[in-house]
Every structure is written in C-alpha cells, then in structure tokens.
C-alpha cells in the first residue's frame, strides 16, 4: 500500500498544482458500494422482519399486516390480517405439523366442545377455525357428535382449547389445565429461531425509540460543545463529574434491571422456558459487571489525573478562539452527522432484511376440503369440509406455505459488517480532513475567503481517494481486532482450566491488541492535516505527521493525550446517558425478544454521534498542536505559537501584546522541511478559486 515500504527518508516536495490523490482506492470504494447496493436490493426482495416478529400462518400470510403477497395455487394467501396480529396453533400436541392461523386474540378461556367454540366466536368475534370455514356448521348435531372437524389439520382445533396469552405474538397456553410438556415444547419452538433473526427483528420493532434517543444524543453532544466553549476554565472538571454520575447511574440501573429480571424468572417458572428472558438476564448481568469495572477504572484514572486537568483550560480556550473566528467549523460535523444517520438507518434496515431473508416453499399437501372444480374456497358460504378419501378424485388439496432461509444472503451480513466499519471511518475521515484543512489554513495563512469551504472543496475535488485508503487501512486492522476480542473471551475460559496452549494464545492475543492499537494510533487524523496542506497521498502524509509529532517535546504529547481523554469522557458521558434512557424505555416492552440488543445498538450509535460532534474540538486541538510543533521547530521564538495560549503548555509565557509576532512568510508551512514559496502560495490560491 505504500505505508509499509522501507525506503530511505526522502524530502516530499509540496505540489504547486493539486491533483487527485489515491485514485485507485476511490475506485475500489465505489465498487464496494455498488456491491452493497446490489445486496440491499436482494435483501429488500427476500427479507421481511415482520414474519419473525408476528409470525406467519400455514398459507403464507404474515399476521398483523394489511397486505400480504398473493401466491398462485395458494387460495388462502394474500389476505388482510391487520386485525389478526397473533399466531394460533390449532393443535399444540403437533406443533411442527399442525395448521397455523392468524387470530384477533388468543383464547381467553378454556373451550371444551363445538358449542363453546361457536359461543366464543359469537361473543368475542374471534374465529379459531380456518379462514374459509363456515362457523355455523358448529351448530349442527354432526359437529357436536363427530371429530372430523377437529383435527391438527383443521379446519377447527381439537379439544380442549386451552386459555392462552400472547408471547412474542404467539398464543401460548397459560391456564391451570395447560399441559406442562406441551407448553415447554411451544417455548422450545420459539427458542429454535436463530438468535440473529431475533436480535434484528427487535431492532426493527424498536426503531422509533432508536431514532428518538439518537436525536437526543445529538442534543447532548451540542450541549457538551457549548460547555467546552463557554466554560473552558472548569469544563474538564464538569465533564469528569458528568461522566462519573452517568456511569454510576447506568451501573445502578443495570444491577436493578438484573435483580428484576432474576426475580421475575424465579417467581414465574414458566417464563424460564423462554430463552430470550434467560439471555436478557445473563446479558444484563455481564453488562452490569462490565459497567462496574469501567466505573471503578474511570474513578481511579480521574483521581490520578486531577492535577493535570487544570492545565487544559488553555488548550480549550485556544481551540475556542479558533472556532470563534471560524464559525463555519460547525458545518462539517453536522454534515457528517446527517451522512452517518442516513447510513446507519440504511444499514440497520438492510441487515434486518438480510437476517430475515427467506422464500416461500411448499409443505406436504394436506387434503382438507372437498371442492368442486368451480368452487371457490374463499367465498363459498356453504362450504362443508370433509376429509378426503384416498382415491376420491373430486377432492382438491390445500398447499401449505413454509418459508426457507436464503443462506447466501445470510452470509452477506459479513460484507455489511465490513461496510459499517469502512463507511463510518470514511465519514469520520472526511469530517476530519475538512476541519484539519480549515484550521491549518487559518493558522498559517489566514485567507480572506472561507477556509472551511476551501477545505471541503479540496476534499471533494482531490482527496476522497486518500480518505478511502486511510479508512480502509483502519478497517483492515479493526476487523482482526473484533475477531481477537471474540477469541479473548473463548481463550480466557480455557486459561482458567489450566490450558498452557490457551494461555500462550491469550498472550499472543494481548500482544496483537497492543500492536494493532499502536498502528491504528499511528494512522490518526494528523495525516489528514498534512494532506489538506500539501496535497500528498495518505501514506507519505502519515509519515510526515508522525515525524513532526515525534520530534517535539514529550510534554506536548502528554497534554494532547489528556485533552483527548477528557473529550473521550465527554463522548462516554453522552453514550452512557443515552444507554440509561434506552434501558428505562425498553426493558418493559413485551414485544421484544432480547431488549438488550436495541440498548447496545443505541449506546453504540450515540457514541458514534457524540464522536462526530465532539471530534470537532478534538480535531481542532490536534491540528493546532501539529501546526504549533512545526511552527516552533522552524520559526523558533518568532513563530506565531508564542502569541497563543498553547505557549503555556510548552513551558513558555505567551506574548502579552496583541501584536502578531514577526514571521518569515516562506516558512509558515514547512511540514516537509521544504518551505512554501510566495509563488506557491499564489498558485495555491488561484487553484482553489478555479
């Protein structure tokens, strides 16, 4: 890729006329997105999360839906089931083979014979027989004396019909006479669904809450920016207090939620058969322990950094001064927020459809109705169901629908996971390059036109390829990091059993974490500052930025690191508050299989949004430090850095007068040790206007 080449250091000449950088990587990114769109189209065709959430009957109708697909040769398909949101199994003793229908409500009382079934239909207007069955047939003497209407194949359920309650839109017997073994089998049937389907169907069900809390995270992030700007002298302490309170709050709520979940399972033995509730309890327990550990670590770190927090006032004041003179800096974060919101919404919809992708198939035909060739199943009010004889050619057969998974599309989830990381990093990188370019132009040259618009124009016109390459490199090293995280959890269990091999692998895993973290940190957004100023490719820019920072005082890196840590605490505070709100809103929602899945997604999305907004300050600070490092190295005490508050962080007293210190114009931007000439500056300005 160019980043890994071992060559002697060469002076990188600044370009006088910019040209597009890293074009190949932009083409690769566009091709990747074309593949994502193609996969999305197929997911929309085959995916339907409501089939998992509400269930579907034996004729292919999804319960609780106004419009269902009409299949040829399936007479009872394509029905309007909007008023029938619950799935009812006619015979709970034959769950895998019995007829399933959508009903208005689950049976509210136990029904023992045909007369009670008809009376229930008259009282509750709830039909517990097949859609085409004439319920008046239950009043005949033949219906009360015979069992031919009451079978697992239908048209009506065999007796007794137990009192039931909806569990995840399925009617589960709850009456005192309900057979325990059959109830366990029904819960086992629900538990047999893939966990991935359940998780993504929960995301689909909770999308209004996800959107609401993500919008709140934007508001909280803007409030945090306002605090950084107007309360710079005490904002470090204020953020620490907020994050401590938020971490204590979410830890307390998690432990309280775990207590309630455990108490519910202990008091209602039947609920313990549902794996989703058990999984919720286990997940809350793990998250509560993790939140407790994080809270303790935060308290310890904040305690030991308390003396250094006061010195950050100068850092945030200087960043605030830059933002005050460049109000347009608020533009890139808002654009990035909109782009990320649209992408995350698109991503969630597609992965939900991918996880629920299936296609209709035909179950073994069940001869359920005696029909004339001209008869209509759906509209013949005199229909009298009879079980067909084996050799009777006047009988037609019902074709029952069963959906089968599209395994090829399921595997496409991995491509979308890569797409989530790469596209998110791409959006972050675009924002960072635009901000870095604007701040660098402001620091070195103070152009009369808008530096923000100039930086955005250069990004779109020249540097999208470099952004695509930089975000891909980070993605390549983040994916193994996720894999190693999974291996860490597995190997830790074997290490406790005394496995030397697992212990060795665990050490290698930790070492890999460290190396990957260092490499990703090396490819930080300082490279985008160099790209914005010099117009070079990503890898040379990363090398230049690294050398510029390494050759300067350790104190600069320390203060910069503490400043980034405080901003990270701000992002963590926003994510914690949003996670706390989501737990309170979703934990009592009966329609969710695994409510902790939306909570985790909301927390991650809130952190992403806070990262976009608060990275404005982070990028301004890091860019100013990079500019100050080069300014100090080349211009010494005559550099502009002497007049800023950052001089205190370098152990110097800032200039008291407001007169700008004399500077040599040809040495204003010497990041490559090749100072820009006046002719180059003039050409750059003309190029930006072109």
Swiss-Prot record:
Its main location: membrane. The keyword Membrane applies. It is found in: Membrane. Keywords: Glycoprotein, Membrane, Transmembrane, Transmembrane helix. One of its GO terms (cellular component) is membrane. GO terms for biological process: transmembrane transport. It holds the Pfam family Choline_transpo. Glycans are attached at residues 134, 391. It is a multi-pass membrane protein. One of its GO terms (molecular function) is transmembrane transporter activity. The chain crosses the membrane at residues 23-43, 203-223, 237-259, 282-302, 334-354, 415-435, 464-484, 565-585, 594-614. Belongs to the CTL (choline transporter-like) family. This is Choline transporter-like 1.
């Amino acid at each position: 890729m160019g980043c890994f080449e071992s060559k002697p250091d060469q002076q990188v000449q600044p370009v006088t006329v910019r040209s597009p950088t890293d074009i190949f990587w932009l083409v690769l990114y566009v091709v990747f997105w074309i593949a994502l769109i193609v996969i999305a189209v197929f997911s929309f065709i085959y995916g339907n999360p409501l089939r998992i959430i509400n269930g579907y009957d034996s004729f292919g109708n999804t319960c609780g839906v106004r419009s269902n697909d009409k299949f040829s040769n399936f007479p009872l398909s394509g029905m309007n089931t909007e008023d029938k949101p619950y799935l009812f199994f006619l015979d709970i003793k034959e769950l895998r083979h019995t007829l399933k229908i959508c009903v208005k409500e689950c049976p509210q009382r136990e029904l023992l014979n045909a007369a009670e079934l008809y009376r229930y239909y008259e009282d509750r207007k709830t039909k517990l027989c097949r859609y085409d069955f004439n319920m008046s047939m239950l009043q005949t003497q033949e219906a009360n004396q015979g069992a031919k209407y009451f079978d697992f194949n239908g048209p009506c359920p065999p007796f007794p019909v137990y009192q039931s309650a909806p569990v995840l839109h399925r009617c589960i017997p709850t009456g005192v006479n309900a057979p325990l073994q059959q109830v366990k089998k029904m819960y086992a049937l629900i538990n047999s669904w893939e966990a991935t389907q359940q998780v993504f169907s929960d995301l689909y069900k909770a999308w209004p809450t996800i959107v609401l809390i993500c919008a709140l995270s934007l508001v909280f992030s803007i409030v945090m920016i306002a605090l950084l700007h107007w309360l710079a002298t005490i904002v470090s302490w204020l953020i620490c207090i907020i994050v401590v309170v938020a971490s204590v709050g979410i830890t307390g709520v998690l432990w309280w939620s775990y207590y309630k979940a455990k108490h519910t399972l202990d008091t209602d033995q039947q609920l313990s058969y549902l794996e989703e509730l058990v999984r919720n309890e286990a997940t809350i327990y793990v998250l509560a322990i993790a939140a407790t550990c994080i809270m303790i670590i935060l308290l310890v770190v904040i305690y030991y950094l308390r003396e250094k927090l006061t010195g950050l006032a100068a850092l945030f004041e200087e960043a605030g001064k830059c933002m005050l003179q460049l109000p347009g800096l608020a533009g890139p974060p808002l654009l990035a927020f909109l782009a990320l919101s649209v992408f995350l919404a698109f991503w969630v919809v597609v992965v939900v459809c991918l996880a629920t992708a299936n296609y209709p198939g035909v179950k073994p035909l069940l001869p359920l109705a005696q029909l004339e060739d001209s008869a209509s199943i759906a509209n013949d009010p005199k229909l009298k169901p009879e079980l067909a004889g084996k050799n009777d050619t006047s009988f037609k057969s019902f074709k029952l629908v069963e959906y089968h998974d599209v395994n090829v599309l399921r595997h496409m989830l991995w491509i979308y996971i890569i797409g989530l990381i790469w596209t998110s990093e791409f959006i972050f990188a675009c924002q960072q390059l635009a901000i870095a370019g604007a701040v660098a132009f402001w620091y070195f040259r103070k152009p009369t036109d808008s530096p923000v618009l100039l930086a955005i124009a250069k990004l779109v016109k020249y540097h999208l390829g470099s952004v695509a390459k930089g975000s891909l490199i980070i993605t390549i090293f983040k994916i193994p990091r996720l894999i190693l995280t999974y291996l860490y959890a597995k190997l830790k269990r074997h290490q406790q059993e005394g496995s030397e091999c697992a212990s060795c692998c665990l050490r290698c895993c930790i070492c890999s974490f460290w190396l990957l973290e260092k490499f990703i940190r090396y490819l930080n957004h300082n490279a985008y500052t160099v790209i914005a100023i010099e117009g070079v490719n990503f890898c040379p820019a990363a090398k230049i930025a690294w050398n510029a920072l390494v050759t300067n005082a350790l104190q600069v890196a320390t203060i910069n690191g503490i400043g980034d840590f405080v901003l990270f605490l701000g992002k963590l505070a926003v994510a914690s508050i949003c996670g706390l709100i989501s737990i309170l809103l979703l934990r009592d929602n009966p329609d969710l299989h695994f409510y902790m899945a939306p909570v985790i997604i909301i927390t991650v999305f809130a952190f992403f949004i806070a990262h976009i907004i608060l990275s404005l300050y982070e990028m301004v600070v890091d860019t100013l430090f990079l500019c100050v490092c080069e300014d100090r190295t080349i211009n010494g005490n005559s550099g502009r850095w002497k007049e800023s508050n950052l001089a205190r962080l370098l152990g110097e007293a800032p200039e008291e007068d407001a007169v700008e210190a004399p500077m040599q114009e040809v040495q204003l931007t010497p990041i490559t040790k090749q100072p820009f000439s006046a002719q180059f500056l003039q050409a750059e300005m003309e190029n930006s206007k072109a």
